[in-house]
Amino acid sequence: MNRVFLAGGLRSHIGIRNGIFKHIRPEVLGGRVARALCQKYGLQGPDALICGNAVGPGGNIGRLLLLEGGLPERVPAFTIDLQCASGLAAIHMAALSIMAGEWDVVLAGGAESASLQPQRRYADNDERSSLRNPVFTAAQFRPGEYGDDAMLLGAERAAKAAGITREEADEAALLSQERAKKAAEEGWLKDVILPLFGSSRDEALRKRMSEKLLARAPRVTDFPEGILTAANTCTINDGAAFVMLASERWLRERDLVPSAEIKGFSMIGADSALPPLSADLAVSLLLREKGLFYSDLDAFEYNEAFAVISADFRKKHRDVADRLNRWGGALAYGHPYGASGAEIMIHLMKILEREDGNLGVAAIPAAGGVGEAVLIHHVDEREWTEERERHTAFSIPLEVKL
């Protein structure tokens, strides 16, 4: 089975809904990022492109995006809809294809526009067309008999099940904002953000946040004893992000040093009433399969669409709580749905690189109760070079004298 590496990645800056990208179709946004990533590595086009997308108009946005980006028509491209986890699932699928030897280099990630999310209407012969409002923007995540499937209510139920208080959720939101602000000020992500349309700043980052402001934030649900507010839930966003996955052979033929090696992945079905808790369940399964403990990892990137996700992690894993979302998470940057998986993977690679880490995991909970996680190991340039030299030495034929 072939080894799979992450050569690197690029993302757009993340726009708020009806912000800087409000008129930009997701395939245009994603096409520019995909093209720039190929150009960065001197690549005309990959062997394939896999795109995550959750709220687009349908069709195959992956193929549309590829063509919008001016990449070769010979390159196959397809789209994955695993809601919030779509981009990370795209990376998972790309890794499997390279492991199997089908392709050598694949672009995987996602593109999303909450600003241009289309409205749909139930067909006349659908029993739901008789509803008072037959127009909808989001499809069902689980059957009606399971109860209300709204993500906000799922997060409230998860907070209650995990025993998360409003104060703990607000604390998680404040920490995320402070860490993201520092990362932005220090320019730690500067080389992986593609400036587009005259900007490179993530729009959702707040200029100031405090405990007092968090405490004054109004609740966003009528859930009894609910804890969710506009300040401890993520914004809805526009953005695109892609990573380049490649086989060892492809990288060595081009004398490229990868950022990380993919060491494993997991996808798990969980309680559909408590979707935010599925990310940590996926990580727990993955680490168990690999014989690892949480303490073996140097960084955890969880897509914290709701503060309950990060607050729950810190409550369960106190000894490694400081390793979660070291540069902030979705509570600060926002959540461009299908692009978020590649976005947090890019952040994870940069964190391991900057902080001399070895192992890290990216994880996302998805609507409907599916968790996705991908484990990576940072590649040290010196070790990569030494490994190549050892391989070269063993491959030199010996002169035999008779």
Task: Map each language-model feature to its residues.
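Active-site-proximal alpha-helical scaffold in enzymes
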Residues: 64, 82-112, 159-189, 242-249, ...
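Conserved beta-ketoacyl condensing-enzyme motif
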Residues: 22-85, 89-93, 97-98, 102-106, ...
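N-terminal extracellular/periplasmic Venus flytrap/periplasmic-binding protein-like
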Residues: 11, 23, 27-32, 168-253, ...
